[in-house]
């Protein structure tokens, strides 16, 4: 019999992504742009990490709302970490934590997804 190994969605991992909010919020009502941006970031993290439980960091929320409800940044660089849920009575075994990533000098162009080695922050 072949031994079952852990699936790729089961491992704890951290990745950096650039999310193009402009494309995801095109045609959205002005007064709903910032709330919808947060929803789109959650949706992106669910798809990328395969977890239903997504937690958005306060600093990321402040960055999205920094220019008001209408003027959301076109692109945002985020770090998504899939982590184990320590609560015993939690529904999901894993959750995703979305934080702001440090942007290298220059622009966001040409930066693809990157796997981050675990360094205890």
UniProtKB/Swiss-Prot annotation:
Pfam family, one: Ribosomal_L31e
Keywords: Ribonucleoprotein, Ribosomal protein
Organism domain of life: Eukaryota
Annotated GO biological process: cytoplasmic translation
Entries under SMART domains matching the protein: Ribosomal_L31e
Listed GO MF terms: structural constituent of ribosome
Family recorded in the similarity comment: Belongs to the eukaryotic ribosomal protein eL31 family.
Name of this protein: Large ribosomal subunit protein eL31
Lineage: Eukaryota, Viridiplantae, Streptophyta, Embryophyta, Tracheophyta
Gene coding for it: RPL31
